[in-house]
Design a protein with these regions (language model features):
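Single-stranded RNA-binding regions, centering on S1/OB-family and related RNA-binding modules
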Residues: 1-231
């Protein structure tokens, strides 16, 4: 079942489908072991890489979880809190008590205005999907520089696999500082040429759809990268 890196058509499975025998292989995201079989837990394409079997989703929607690192966009500022788009079906709220600034009542827009991007963590998600965010933590801040780019949620595991090898290549080739958030947003800070290259690459990956094509598309774009990094 080694079909992941040679461009072959991957097998499409649905939840509950038997992917194949375990046979000493490990299980990654989108699958589980049941008896001696590997079973799919989501709709997607089967991928095997270095002895690990995963199911890459055909499409994913970000669903917030406590502890997630997210980049939110301010869409409303009230007297004592902000509402933010976090690229999912539910907005997040940031109370001024969980902001990193000393905020006077009614002065929220003096610190984070409409369309500002904030690096936050999800503090709590309740049973009706109310999402509370916090900026109390190391590195959490308003992103006053750089650009926020979209990354399909289904590609995040691919970027973080094997010690974030692909993400490190993106950093080196673009010559940008990067922060990859769990909600499908990537902050990039560097020269305009590096940010533009990243934007074009991510659009090409989004058009291809499949996570297994990410590395091949990156290889194709590498020659035009602003920096050749360690390649």
């Amino acid at each position: 079942m080694s079909q992941s890196q040679n461009g072959a058509e991957l097998r499409l499975v649905t939840p509950g489908s038997a992917i194949g025998p375990v046979s000493g292989r490990r299980v990654g995201t989108g699958a589980l072991i049941q008896g001696d079989e590997i079973i799919a837990t989501r709709v997607g394409h089967v991928r095997e890489r270095h002895g690990t079997v995963s199911v890459d989703p055909v499409a994913s929607c970000y669903m917030p979880r406590s502890g997630d690192l997210v980049i939110g966009t301010v869409i409303e500022a009230r007297s004592n809190l902000w509402f933010l788009d976090i690229n999912g079906p539910f907005q997040a709220l940031l109370p001024m008590s969980l902001a990193p600034w000393k905020v006077e009542f009614g002065g929220t827009r003096d610190h984070a205005d409409i369309n500002d991007s904030l690096l936050m963590r999800v503090q709590e998600v309740d049973e009706v999907q109310n999402v509370v965010a916090t900026m109390k933590g190391i590195g959490l801040r308003r992103l006053a520089e750089g650009a926020v780019l979209d990354v399909d949620v289904q590609h995040i595991d691919t970027l973080r696999a094997e010690g974030a090898a692909l993400l490190k290549r993106l950093r080196d080739l673009s010559d940008c500082r990067l922060v990859l958030a769990d909600n499908g947003r990537l902050w990039a800070d560097g020269d305009a040429s590096g940010i533009d290259w990243l934007r074009a690459l991510l659009r090409a990956v989004a058009a291809a759809g499949r996570s297994d094509r990410f590395e091949a598309i990156l290889d194709a774009h590498a020659a035009n990268a602003p920096s050749q990094g360690d390649a």
